[in-house]
Amino acid sequence: MTPPVTVGVDGFPESRAAADWAAREAVLREAPLRLVHVEDWPHTPFMPAVGQLENAGPVGAEELRRGADAVLEEMTDDVRRRHPGLQVSARRMPGRAAAVLAVQAADSQMLVLGSRGRGAVEGFLLGSVGIATVGLTATPVVLVRPPREPVPAPAAPAAYRDVVVGVDVREDTDALLGFAFEEAARRGCAVRAVHGWSLPFAFGYAPQLDPGVRQEVADGIAEALSERLSSWRRRYPSVKAEERVLVGAPAVQVLYEAADADLVAVGRRIRRAPVGGHLGHVAHAVLHHATAPVAVIAHD
């Protein structure tokens, strides 16, 4: 049986955007789609209804469950209408959202989540469930933001933009590049590999630096990046791969290149310690500020 693409849904606009993106991804992968709604609320007789207006008044847990079932049914029907022929299943499960979603991701090709909109500060904010879930699963996790305007069901296949991938040539990049090339091959688009760098302060201020040193470092990074891409270029000869070695903070450079991307892929190192962060600063910044869907790929 083909593993599904799993998407977490709760009825909010972010999860609806995630469900639509996940459905299109499932079609590309020729995989079934699984919608999961997690009952993650306090166990009290009465509580505010999730997804309802603040002045809707308290409702019981059973009514919340009926509301969740209605959301699942409505979203399932909408996906089937927009993507006829796609196999869709839905399930409602109790528990803590991040933990349940991580378990559901274990037998999936991919987990897709909605990412919240703008917060009080400039830029987007990633919800705590998204951050926690990314750190709990080795399955690729894609965070999707809602479009500013509703996206109609496509009448015909549209051309895809590039898949942008942030590459640190000092890290193990096989899983990350493999994901990026595979996604680009499915879409018939290019891969744009981005590495941002700057000289350590030990080299002194730029005006005092021998230009030859800067060029030597840049050439070394470009060679390392090209070497990382070489085996994937051979494996996916139909995928055009572009290299971007840019001076500046890596997160800033990836975000700049991602502005016109169809999908952005970043890596995260698997950390087995029970405490501490599970996201590096580049992945963290891209997740919070990129407008395109962001895929987080775990690696050792």
Residue spans of the language-model regions?
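General small-molecule cofactor/ligand-binding pocket signal
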Residues: 34-36, 89-93, 142, 192-194, ...
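Structural beta-alpha unit
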Residues: 1, 14, 62, 66, ...
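Small/aliphatic-rich secondary-structure junction motif
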Residues: 1-56, 159-211, 233, 240-241, ...
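Short beta-strand elements of ligand-binding domains
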Residues: 114-115, 141-147, 295-298
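Structured core of small recognition/catalytic domains
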Residues: 189-266, 277
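Short, structured interface segments
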Residues: 130-151
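A short acidic, glycine-rich active-site loop
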Residues: 55-70, 211-221
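Glycine-rich, Arg-bearing micro-motifs that act as flexible, cationic patches
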Residues: 110-132, 160, 263-288
